[in-house]
Curated annotation (Swiss-Prot):
Protein's name in the database: Inorganic pyrophosphatase
The family this protein is said to belong to: Belongs to the PPase family.
PROSITE patterns: PPASE
Localization: Cytoplasm
Keyword set, alphabetical order: Cytoplasm, Hydrolase, Magnesium, Metal-binding
EC number(s) on file: 3.6.1.1
Residues that, per the record, bind Mg(2+) 1: 62, 67, 99
Binding annotation for Mg(2+) 2: 67
Residues bound to substrate: 26, 40, 52, 138
Gene Ontology MF: a single term: magnesium ion binding
NCBIfam families noted in UniProt: PRK01250.1 (NF002317)
Gene: ppa
Enzyme class: hydrolase
Amino acid sequence: MKLSPGKNAPDVVNVLVEIPQGSNIKYEYDDEEGVIKVDRVLYTSMNYPFNYGFIPGTLEEDGDPLDVLVITNYQLYPGSVIEVRPIGILYMKDEEGEDAKIVAVPKDKTDPSFSNIKDINDLPQATKNKIVHFFEHYKELEPGKYVKISGWGSATEAKNRIQLAIKRVSGGQ
């Protein structure tokens, strides 16, 4: 069974959760073996502020699926799939190049708590600060690794990025 980006992409997309909110372990999905593997324990004394995964059936220029941070008030199990609404994008680079993160919330039917959040600017500033702080610092103690944040993008920018990443898989770009 091959998981798709979602029937209503880019407005609502599937996210395969790799890392639960609160974890200090970086898990990664191994496509060849179809399992989630431990990549590493974070070197810093930090935990992922929200659930983290990727949109299946997408491809970024670096060859990886498009990363997503799913804003919830609870942990999601690694390997679970949740339908989300993209609300923005965090532009950043790391030691390997561009590594933007889509920011999303559960679709309204899954969790109506986030129905008022339509765009990144609808998130509380404290939540955005927490996200930026995490990504600016989570690799600090790892030799040769770094992250540089360049800013936020809107829900429209996030959806455009998703469409482009889907086209890369389907041969459109």
